[in-house]
Amino acid sequence: MSINIEQAIIHEISQDSQGQLRCRLRPQPLLNGQAVEMMLEELHQTYTSKSGKGFGYFGIHGDDGEANPAFANALKEYRAGDLGFVEFTGQASKLLQEELAKYDFSQGGFLLMSCYTSMASDYLFVALLSAKSSMTVLDDMELSQNNHLDLNNIQLAARIDLTELQADKDSRKYISFIRGRAGRKVADFFLDFMGCVEGVNTKAQNKTLMNAVEDFVASSDLTKEERQQCRNKVFEYCSERFDEGADIEIKDLADELADQGMESFYDFARGGSYELDEEFPADKSTLRQLKKFSGTGGGVTISFDGGHLGQRVIYDPISDTILIKGVPANLKDQLDRRLKGE
């Protein structure tokens, strides 16, 4: 296993016959058996691999809008040993119930909370899971419908880096959370119940890094091939950091580039007007533009590796055209068939 589970528990928030939300609290933690280990391992992998996560911190009531300090205070008591895990998670469930009650769309769900260790960091994982209906075949070959937790489609989840929280009280990124689809913050209520305030604009930082890299290679004496190697190296480094759940460190990245013969990136990035933080989380979807060009519009979708620009792919901005040399075999086959049919 890539994680070491300390404790885990599930509480249920559901609607009663009058449509009121109620908490059904589990009286003891889940036993750390195979089922729990497999579930949390899967959730850990799924959550870690999700790109586009947001990052924040516990807001201070009054200074950061209407941030609710109740969750942070309960967590502090739990970490200090003044509150048991069951009591802490029970309080959290009731806080979530109160927040959900403000919205008409909520149906509740199963609140999973778990403390575990991964890569020498302690985490508190918080997720509101939903049940999904499925069919199974019984021993007598009859079909039966049952419900199971939908672990592959988690949309309401957050993870608190307890190690970073303890080491750096001024950090603004020790809480990560899943953003809503298409950039919509559909999970605002989930962050509100924890009193989480967004602290780092991850996409903006990654976009700025990408711009700094492009400006760096443009101002250098590198050949075209060396420039693409630089972009590829940046993407490779950032991808590794993303997969490890670690931050991009500008100094560390500059050292990686220096090892490849590309000196002075750190001074270039810090000396300009880029306003890059020394450390920030990686966003693969943004940085992928270092390796690929892609775009969609008017019923046309184009995607190709950056190294092909100027060789197999010729762009003429004056005529607003793209020429592709060596059409992919499967596309060529489709086009030839269509021409013959016409």
Swiss-Prot record:
Predominant cellular place of this UniProt entry's protein: cytoplasm
GO CC aspect terms: bacterial nucleoid; cytoplasm
Any one Gene Ontology molecular-function term assigned to this protein's record: double-stranded DNA binding
UniProt keyword list: Cytoplasm
InterPro entries tied to this protein: Nucleoid_associated_NdpA
Family (UniProt): Belongs to the YejK family.
Protein name: Nucleoid-associated protein SO_2177
High-level lineage: Bacteria, Pseudomonadati, Pseudomonadota, Gammaproteobacteria, Alteromonadales
